[in-house]
Regions:
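A generic structural motif
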Residues: 71-77, 162-167, 263-267, 348-356, ...
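Transmembrane beta-strand segments that form the barrel wall of outer-membrane beta-barrel proteins
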Residues: 7-15, 21, 33-35, 39-51, ...
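Outer-membrane beta-barrel translocator/channel fold
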Residues: 18, 22-24, 43-66, 79-80, ...
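Feature captures outer-membrane beta-barrel proteins of Gram-negative bacteria and organelles
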Residues: 1, 7-11, 22-39, 45, ...
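Intrinsic low-complexity, glycine/proline- and repeat-rich
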Residues: 471-512
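Extended amphipathic alpha-helical coiled-coil/heptad-repeat regions
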Residues: 282, 286, 318-328, 333-334, ...
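Transmembrane beta-barrel outer-membrane domains
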Residues: 24-28, 38, 50-52, 220-222, ...
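Outer-membrane beta-barrel initiation region
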Residues: 68-69, 75-312, 376-381, 512
Length: 512
């Protein structure tokens, strides 16, 4: 009709005999009509009438991952680099004067905080400055490192010739990024500034950096919290293909010292479209995941997780983690992880082991009810030891592979393979599959565990820098074979953003 309005008419010879007999709908007319109105390129409103027994209004939202709905990311402009005055001279031994170091920390801390960057430590000699920082804002670590380098270059005495930035993520120092100060002053405004700066930069392992003696005053303890809406979804149930729950979620994190993190999440369901009767699993395997619907339906505020974590560097190329508490919604216990990952390598090797017990449906205690096809029974206890040897590899063009071999929650042994494609704007799309020694028949419908993973950066959707990502795993069925512990912040995911392959992939944002 017009560029924005479209009228559609359809004649269907299908009498829908089986669907009508099953009571799904009444088929009163073979004619279907629809009127589309394109409000914006990404928003369409449709009014329709179909089968002679249904009318409705439909709103369709479309999006292209290449184009942010919030437009170009609106970043805070970085500070310009001020070249050192040739006549500026710092007294010999100035770095040994405690009051000067304290004054630098006092001056740098609030300015970095405006950029969403926390100053964790500052180590000084007359010619070298090493700043340990944690980036809480920028999706790209090179962008945060560039902001820190600019500020240090402007604030430090002229005798400092070398500046190093140690990016820390959740208590883990992954690398040391070292710049000649002359290069910072020379390449800021040149056409090839980013590539020239990368050529002048050295990236090394940060295990040898003396973090504790260089700790910034007031860096710890830290406390943060957030409160907001939360949506959870359960898909592909035959009785309710799209089950949604809208709730409120409170998350808190306390960091009493470097590497020590205490985190917790409390969720309250507000409204949902769950069916009145939950689906009772018919799995003949121990119900390590197939009873998840009873966890979703718990009344009252639910403590989803409450953990104490310690992350540390046991040596060069090595990273470690200990965790204890309610590790995830369905399991609590102890977990340990060790990762070997050279700073300039595309390959990493990790080992994780956990001793866990299944939690109660209400989130408190460790006595879930027995579930059979006949209904709920007496409380039971289930504990297990699970763990995996994991290999990671970063291919070119944003492809990342992960292979896990080990013992799963149902005490089955097997292997998982996952392949992800990561895009420059932060989107991640991938798929995984798991095969264990549980037979296809014993596994039940679906034969083996598989799914699609997606990760969407908040910065893409809101047009402002943010390190928060929205993650979802789409499984056709949630069964008990090949089930893994759902731990957050595994070491490889924390470390790799600060290593050479990922830094080089995002280095174009260094001067942003």
């Amino acid at each position: 009709m017009t560029d924005k309005v479209t009228l559609k008419a359809e004649y269907s010879s299908d009498a829908y005999t089986q669907e009508v007999a099953a009571g799904h709908f009444e088929h009163r007319s073979p004619f279907n009509l629809a009127l589309d109105y394109q409000i914006k390129p990404t928003i369409q409103l449709t009014a329709y009438a179909q089968h002679g027994d249904e009318i409705g209004i439909l709103a369709s939202l479309t999006s292209n991952p290449k184009h942010s709905p919030g437009g170009a990311t609106r970043d805070r402009a970085p500070m310009p680099v001020l070249p050192r005055a040739k006549a500026q001279v710092a007294p010999a031994g100035w770095s040994e004067i405690p009051s000067l170091r304290s004054a630098l920390i006092t001056a740098l801390t609030p300015v970095l905080r405006q950029d969403g960057i926390q100053l964790i430590g500052l180590s000084l000699t007359d010619t070298i400055a090493i700043a340990t920082v944690e980036n809480h804002r920028y999706q790209s670590q090179p962008q945060a490192i560039g902001h820190v380098a600019r500020l240090l270059s402007n604030a430090l005495p002229a005798s400092v010739d070398t500046i190093a930035v140690v990016p820390m993520v959740k208590g883990i120092a992954g690398s040391q990024v070292i710049f000649p100060r002359d290069a910072l002053e020379a390449h800021e405004a040149t056409a090839t500034g980013a590539s020239d700066m990368r050529a002048a930069t050295i990236v090394t392992d940060a295990a040898a950096v003396d973090h504790r003696s260089a700790a910034a005053e007031g860096a710890f303890p830290q406390f943060s919290w957030s409160f907001g809406p939360d949506v959870s979804a359960s898909l592909f149930d035959p009785d309710n293909p799209v089950a949604l729950s809208l709730g409120a979620k409170l998350t808190a994190e306390w960091v009493p010292a470097r590497g020590v993190y205490v985190t917790g999440t409390l969720r309250q369901n507000i409204v949902d479209n769950y069916t009145s009767t939950p689906r009772y699993s018919d799995s003949i395997i121990t119900h390590v995941r197939s009873d998840s619907t009873f966890y979703d339906r718990a009344d009252g505020p639910v403590l989803q997780d409450l953990t104490a974590n310690y992350r540390f560097r046991p040596g060069t190329n090595l990273y470690g983690r200990f965790s204890a508490g309610y590790l995830e919604r369905m399991y609590g216990g102890l977990s340990a992880e060790l990762l070997w990952k050279p700073v300039d390598s595309k390959f990493g090797l990790g080992f994780e082991v956990s001793a866990v017990r299944q939690r109660s449906f209400d989130g408190l205690g460790f006595a879930p009810l027995t579930v059979t096809t006949a209904g709920l029974g007496a409380p039971r206890s289930y504990d297990t030891i699970t763990g995996h040897l994991s290999g990671y590899y970063a291919f070119d063009d944003g492809l990342h592979a992960q292979v896990d071999v080990g013992r799963y929650l149902a005490k089955d042994w097997g292997m998982s393979v996952q392949l992800n494609r990561e895009f420059n704007n932060g989107w991640k799309v991938g798929a995984y599959a798991t095969l264990t020694d549980i037979s296809f028949d014993d596994f039940g419908e679906g034969s083996f565990d598989k799914g699609i993973v997606m990760e969407i950066p908040t910065s893409w959707s809101i047009g402002r820098p943010s390190r928060v990502n929205w993650s979802v795993v789409i499984r056709p069925l949630l069964r008990d074979g090949g089930a893994k512990l759902d731990l957050s912040d595994r070491l490889y995911d924390l470390v790799r953003d600060t290593h050479v392959p990922q830094l080089e992939a995002q280095w174009g944002r260094f001067w942003r």
